[in-house]
């Protein structure tokens, strides 16, 4: 009886691992965009943190260099936050909302 139950648990774990791998593959191609300065600076990255684009509104090119740098940093931070939220949401679909320990990171994230 225990043996059959353990086999079932192992099978479920394998299925969950396969679903998690599929979600990770999907996230690698999913793009999110972080913004700062009311959308004047945008950073687009995949959910595995590869930056695809950085867009800076032309009107900022004549502004203070420090301000533009701050806006770029804020847009990057916003993009990273959005990646984390999207990844958590997609992984939650796989884990069925199973609570994970605080600070627990899924492999590949």
Swiss-Prot record:
Residues 86-109 are annotated as: Disordered. InterPro entries: YbaB-like_sf, YbaB/EbfC. GO terms for molecular function: DNA binding. GO terms for cellular component: bacterial nucleoid; cytosol. It comes from the Bacteria. It is found in: Cytoplasm, Nucleoid. The keyword Methyltransferase does not apply. Residues 99-109 have a biased composition (Pro residues). Keywords: Cytoplasm, DNA-binding. HAMAP family: DNA_YbaB_EbfC. PANTHER family: NUCLEOID-ASSOCIATED PROTEIN YBAB. Belongs to the YbaB/EbfC family. Binds to DNA and alters its conformation. May be involved in regulation of gene expression, nucleoid organization and DNA protection. Homodimer. This is Nucleoid-associated protein MADE_1013280. It comes from Alteromonas mediterranea (strain DSM 17117 / CIP 110805 / LMG 28347 / Deep ecotype).
